[in-house]
Amino acid sequence: MKKYRKISIGCFAMATQTSHVFHGQENMFLENHCIRRNTGRDSKKPLKQKNMNGLGQNSDNGLLVTHVNQTQDLLRLQGSETQSSDWEDSEDWLSAHSLKCQKLTLADLISQGTEVLEEGTNVVQKICFSTQIIRHFESKLSDTIEVYQERIQWLTENSKKAFGLIKGARVSILIDVSAISSGPQKEEFQKDLMSLIDEQLSHKEKLFVLSFGTNAGSLWPDPMEVSASTLQELKLWVKTLQPDGGSNLLQALKKIFTLKGLDSLVAIMRSCPDQPSEILSDYIQQSTMGRDLIIHFITYRCDDQMPPAVLKNLAEAVRGYYHCYSPKMEHYTSRDMDELLAEIQKAQSLLSHVQALQHSSPCEALTCTMEEISTEITNGPLISLLPKPPKHDAPLTIEFPNLDKTSAEWLKVNGLKAKKLSLYQVLAPNAFSPVEEFVPILQKTVSSTIHEKAMIQFEWHDGTVKNIHVDPPFLYKYQQQLSRAMRMYERRIEWLSLASRRIWGTVCEKRVVVLLDISATNSMYIIHIQHSLRLLLEEQLSNKDCFNLIAFGSTIESWRPEMVPVSHNNLQSAWRWALNLRCRGSRNVLSALRKAVEVDFKDKDKHQSQGIYLFTGGIPDQDMPTLSAYMAEACGGCDLQLNVCLFYVGEPKMDTTPPARYASHTDTAAAYKEVTRAAGGRFHWFGDTGIYESDDINSIMSEMEKALNYSQKCAFLMASLKNHSGKVLGSSALPKEKPKTLQLRSQPKKLCPPRPTVPLGARMSIKDDPDREKSPPLKSLKWRPLSSRVGISPAAAQPTKEGMMELRRKTKSREAETSLLLFYTEKGNDVGSVYKKYPQGRGLRRTSSSIDLPRKDTVCSSQEWVAKYGLKKLKLEISRCMGPNCTHQKSGQRSASAKHCSIFPSVEIHGVVRHIQWTPREMEVYIRHLEKVLRRYVQRLQWLLSGSRRLFGTVLESKVCILLDTSGSMGPYLQQVKTELVLLIWEQLRKCCDSFNLLSFAESFQSWQDTLVETTDAACHEAMQWVTHLQAQGSTSILQALLKAFSFHDLEGLYLLTDGKPDTSCSLVLNEVQKLREKRDVKVHTISLNCSDRAAVEFLRKLASFTGGRYHCPVGEDTLSKIHSLLTKGFINEKDPTLPPFEGDDLRILAQEITKARSFLWQAQSFRSQLQKKNDAEPKVTLS
């Protein structure tokens, strides 16, 4: 235990101090690893170091060593294996070694204990742990902390200390030379850069380096493949770096973003950039939109010139990585380091609880009898173990804010109409309505006309058409004003997205009551609720007149009986009260609203500017129409608004007590929006990823869209003016360019009969064809060989009538755009042609300009979805870019290939040579389409792995029954199944099904209802209550459950969830189901929770196949986390790992299509590179 106590103290020191220095023998293995990497192929030093550290006494691994060279080879092999894992991406490494992945969380410890129930009830009174379990868990925690310490020590060695761990394979390096000075500092900087090149950059695929100061200069024009020569050239270039004025980072970024093929950007900064961080952040985000680019910001020796927090904030804004290094204080921080430290703090906190638990009783069976722990375990997670922000319990740091306004009020002063920037306001002086009057002399109505198109007709806001005099300089000035207004609106949106406004929006009223949701479903988020309230008290409430806080669950708890004036003491008192809040009960929103309206705002008619801010995370206990009616009546006739701040906390967890009401996050948001509309307030919805919806931001966005619309109409006016000018100029030149002879030759009857040189059939096929004007261009019907050596007779090559018809069918798609005039020349044998309508460009002749894919996921099987949006249906097979098999090499009549064998690149596929018939542009379009389709496939796969679909799959039918196995073997899975079943009821059955029923089976079956029940809210709540009482016991009688389910009237689909085979014969079950299927067309979809039992899996597959259903096997947590990591990183590059094999039908079919799309994408990228190489190799023709 002393060892564990020592490690715990060491972790605390590391987490609280700024200098991360570790000592001891536990890091020797990583030191050996780094020494091996730095010494390259020198195997003597690693061997010597290993013996010195005492790590050479490893047990024999079965390999007999007979020579010293073999020992060195084994050590080198071992070093390479450990090197690959150590140099793994930090996120991947941490996900594989996290406490959750190693099952070292508090929930994992509690699951190993034995529950002791209170007599006569199902309430957990105690949880018992054996000494062996406690010691084993403590030992694993200590070992994990040591691994984290070793990882941190490794991250602070060699080049990683100064520059961090460089991610990516194709890296661009930006080096700030503004602060380079001669002397020891310059030599040390060059030395560190040399270490970075040798240790990390030498293992990359491509490199591009650029130095910048006032100006930017690169070593190479394009990214270079990493080789010994390029690395040597890079080292020589580093030695020549000289200081260059300022630090123009923006100019360097502009040069980098023009390059293609890079996946990592590293900026090594030595001083503060010339541009503000807001401008750099916006530019980086816009330039990297749609690109998978890893961004690193590294601060090197910039203590005096720039605080490291500047670039750290910039890196966080663009979701990149940061690394700060200060050799004076030996201080280095990075995102990788911070994540490791956070994990160590969690491990150390948990270790202290485990140690306290072990010392609480000396007996063999330790019993947790402390009331606090047992109560918190019963109610939810331990609050003391939840992560807290820095200085969470400290007193408030109160600021005095400005007088904020809602966006609607702000736009009354800064909107386009208020600034007189409405397009119709601007154009009104130069807009004239068309005049139309009746002329008595002419006895008809005469309309005014515009002289020589001097004005442009333009649709006005009321639907009428006006004549506009277009003044280009005036419109240019107006466009500049619109641009300034757009920038102002962007700054407003950015301001609304920062600090407490990101959570609460703008609190503008002078009298405020805040309602806090502390229901049991928010137990995991109590720290978040408290921190959000802290930000509000510090930043937005100090300039108010009165305020109060009300917390509500099943009951309400108020900080003060009524509103009190805002003061420093009252704000601090309110914060201390909030720190003691605990989550419990349901979500009684109506009681909290009644307390605020009827007590705090009892004299609401006598005051102005009053607001209620409801901070909640889910649907209330009461019906939304009731809340809407109550608030509409309460807010009517007075200046009182209800503003809702909704935070998304995920789906509610299943507990012994289900929530009073359930709704998805989208339905919850829609319900609260109705309440805010009825109460004249504002709606604000946010989550951990940002703001989802905000009325304040929507108002600004609407004004920006209006400005954009005005700008587009200005561009339309300018384009119309240019078109009119072009028409006037071109009208006089057009008759001169159009010869009259072309119109005469278009008449077939005036053609002179030529000499009978060409076969009659070919000539008559042209003469008698009434649509020959739409024929493709033919220069002559004379046959010409493809090469100089030809053994085919000219007669065989003459076009026949069938050949001409086939040619027209192939060009039918271009007939609408192309119109030709054919005629015979004086030579008689030749046919000439003249375009009457020119053909469109053929750059995309085999690829469509757009791919139609659904934005939202439709409820259907993967087989149906792939049939609609698969690669074959979208015509995206790679074979479409390939020509037929090349037979020119096999010709016996000639030795040379045809001419186009040298023109079109060829590839060998399965031993057959085929030509690539697409141009580089067509191949580029095809690759873009494939990447778009692949992203959509990945989105569909993520949808299938989310929510209740992960366990149950997708429910397709409208009248279904869920069969749930509750036998004794289901005990380990039952709690998870109950949670997912509640989610299934609300997420799929409530939304997509007309009627449903639930049926559990073990030795016998138990149905929720006798028949299918209509899907309503009340029915779903009753089903939830029924699910909570399910218990696992007995055997597995599947046949009886199926017979009962088939008896339900109008049943369309059955969903059978089990973990094994039936107690009876599998063939008997299949035969009985086959007989039932003959009478009723009911599909049975099977779900297996135990994929290791292959016999059970085969039985469930056959059962689903016989009935036309689908087999589904849920993905495990470990596999799911790996898949999520793959899908979020892009999953497009060839080096990315493949998807794991899926058992379920829906996942397997979609994964096969994804694999096929990735294969096509890699082949297309290879073909594109061949086409580019061939184009680069062709000699360029210059015109003199």
UniProtKB/Swiss-Prot annotation:
TM segment ranges: none
Ranges in a coiled coil: 333-357
UniProt source species: Homo sapiens
Protein name stated in the entry: von Willebrand factor A domain-containing protein 3A
Lineage: Eukaryota, Metazoa, Chordata, Craniata, Vertebrata
Subcellular locations according to the entry: Secreted
Glycosylation sites: N709
PROSITE patterns named among the record's database cross-references: VWFA
VWFA domain ranges (all copies): 511-708, 959-1131
Ranges of biased composition (kind: Basic and acidic residues): 765-776
Signal peptide (residue range): 1-24
